[in-house]
């Protein structure tokens, strides 16, 4: 059966007739009139899956895209589920600067208001961590953040936190997990047509928690001077809050001018993710021009944070997520952190060693901050994909803005001592033992290739890697781990969001990583 043959024209027409947005309704009707089965099949490939990351898709017409109809029905399902648990649910709502974000925020607020909830609406174009902070600080029962984080420009999304009377203890203010996600998805499926969902402005309250957020984040460090920071928001929403925080703490801040203002088209980068090759080129150029001590880069919704530093040879080097995680963990431990450190299982084992060195607890969790943030008595958590949580009491999620001030403080400490962040990292290796990491990713067009690769891993794992026998194989819900006699570790798992097979390589000998990668390429044959 062809893709075109699966189009239900009556369903698409009914959707368009009940779409509250005349533009997307008109688009669907145009496709119907033209007989454009390819576009219709893509737009009606099934409802957007409401998972633990909420929703994320391209902005456009139809049930499979991000649009007003989808946001309205999703919010109806969410508030219906919340009302099963509490009376008059209180929901904080934030949004970034992507296409459609402000409208989606207004729609969500009006649905919550009409359903008997109370909507706390944050100023538009602000970081995701501000919404997460607001859920905890104002004891909201839930939080909605309209964002697609570092996705391509065409996308938007809808992220949900639970708190207040719904989630308490370590889970307060954290992204939802199963079974709540499935229960909310069921409620969304039962929602009426979008234009039949009541809207109201009666119970909408504008709230602004930026001052409280800045007060809290500023307490993470003391006042510093004599450190110059090049800061880029990657065309996202982090510049204003980040610059205020860093300046307040005494740092000299210079924004990368081409990337300072929010722009949903992200014109200077091919992909708005600080991890991507070339994404920091403008930032590094600016850092060199102003003689910066460090370059700090937020991703578009500022929940993640990358750093680059000058080397002894005069070039600049971007720190990996694992390197930054080790530096932050060591710094926070030396500043008197108590409780537990945590990182995802695909992140380096180095944080566990650092925690043990300072007498702190350590937990290894499944991938995703929804699991890291649930660690009891959490003092610091991170994932290798440049996500860091330096103040979990305030923000139980990744927080690029708060992370940036801790990184800046660490840079100031190093400068005052006549050393560098890279030298500090070597000092950590000397104290607890070196571990170096490297990613290896296989992108495929056919998802069956990934399934075959994972079957091979389960049935016949590699006998050796870079000449060292594989001594142990451990399976976990998302994949497998290999350990060699040399204490190398390889983790293999499918990507949860893209058609990729992801491998995470770690070794006490950096020179072995390329050889391990070569052996894995030969092993998988992809």
Predicted regions and their residues:
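Gly/Ser/Thr-enriched, mixed-charge loops and adjacent short helices
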Residues: 15-19, 23, 37-48, 156-287
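Conserved phosphate/anionic-ligand binding catalytic regions in large, soluble enzymes, centered on
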Residues: 44-64, 148-151, 233-241, 245, ...
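N-terminal small/polar loop signature for handling phosphorylated ligands or for N-terminal nucleophile
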Residues: 92-155, 245-307
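Phosphate-binding and adjacent anionic-ligand microenvironments
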Residues: 288, 292-294, 298, 315-317, ...
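An N-terminal, well-structured beta->alpha segment
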Residues: 3-108, 114-115, 203-227, 237
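Short acidic, glycine/serine/threonine-rich loops at helix termini
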Residues: 102-107, 132-136, 154-162, 196-197, ...
């Amino acid at each position: 059966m062809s893709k075109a043959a699966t189009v239900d024209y009556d369903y698409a027409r009914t959707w368009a007739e009940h779409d509250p947005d005349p533009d997307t309704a008109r688009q669907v009707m145009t496709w119907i009139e033209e007989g454009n089965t390819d576009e219709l099949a893509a737009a009606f490939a099934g409802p957007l899956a409401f998972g633990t990351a909420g929703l994320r898709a391209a902005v456009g017409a139809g049930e499979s895209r991000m649009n007003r109809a989808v946001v309205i029905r999703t919010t109806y399902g969410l508030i219906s589920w919340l009302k099963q648990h509490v009376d008059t649910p209180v929901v904080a709502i934030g949004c970034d600067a992507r296409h459609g974000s402000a409208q989606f925020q207004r729609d969500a607020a009006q649905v919550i208001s009409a359903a008997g909830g109370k909507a706390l609406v944050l100023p538009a174009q602000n970081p995701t961590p501000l919404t997460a902070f607001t859920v905890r600080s104002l004891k909201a029962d839930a939080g909605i953040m309209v964002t697609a984080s570092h996705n391509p420009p065409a996308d938007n999304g809808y992220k949900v936190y639970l708190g207040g009377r719904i989630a308490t203890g370590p889970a307060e203010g954290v992204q939802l997990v199963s079974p709540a996600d499935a229960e909310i998805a069921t409620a969304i499926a039962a929602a009426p047509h979008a234009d039949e969902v009541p809207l109201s402005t009666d119970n909408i309250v504008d709230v602004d928690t930026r001052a409280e957020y800045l007060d809290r984040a500023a307490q993470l460090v003391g006042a510093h001077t004599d450190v110059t920071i090049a800061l880029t928001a990657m065309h996202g929403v982090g510049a204003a809050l980040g610059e205020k925080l860093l300046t307040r703490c005494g740092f000299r801040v210079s924004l990368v001018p081409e990337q300072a203002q929010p722009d949903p088209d992200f014109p200077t980068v091919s992909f708005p993710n600080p991890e991507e090759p070339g994404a920091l080129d403008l930032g590094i150029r600016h850092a060199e021009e102003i003689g910066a001590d460090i370059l700090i880069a937020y991703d578009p919704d500022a929940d993640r944070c990358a750093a680059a530093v000058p080397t002894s040879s005069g070039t600049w080097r971007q720190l990996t997520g694992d390197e930054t995680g080790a530096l932050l963990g060591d710094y926070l431990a030396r500043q008197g952190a108590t409780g537990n450190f945590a990182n995802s299982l695909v992140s380096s084992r180095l944080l566990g060693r650092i925690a043990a060195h300072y007498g702190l607890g350590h937990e290894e969790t499944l991938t995703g901050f929804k699991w890291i943030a649930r660690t009891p008595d959490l003092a610091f958590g991170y994932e290798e994909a440049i996500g860091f949580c330096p103040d979990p009491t305030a923000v139980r999620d990744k927080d690029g803005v708060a992370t940036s001030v801790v990184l800046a403080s660490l840079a100031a400490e190093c400068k005052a001592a006549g050393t560098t962040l890279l030298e500090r990292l070597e000092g950590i290796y000397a104290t607890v033992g070196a571990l170096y990491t490297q990613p290896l990713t296989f992108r495929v067009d056919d998802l069956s290739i990934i399934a075959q690769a994972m079957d091979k891993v389960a049935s016949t794992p590699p006998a050796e890697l870079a000449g060292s026998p594989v001594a142990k194989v451990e399976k976990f819900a998302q994949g497998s781990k290999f350990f060699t006699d040399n204490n190398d570790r390889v983790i293999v798992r499918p990507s949860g969001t893209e058609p990729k097979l992801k491998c995470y390589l770690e070794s006490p000998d950096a020179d072995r990583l390329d050889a391990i990668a070569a052996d894995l390429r030969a092993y998988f044959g992809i």
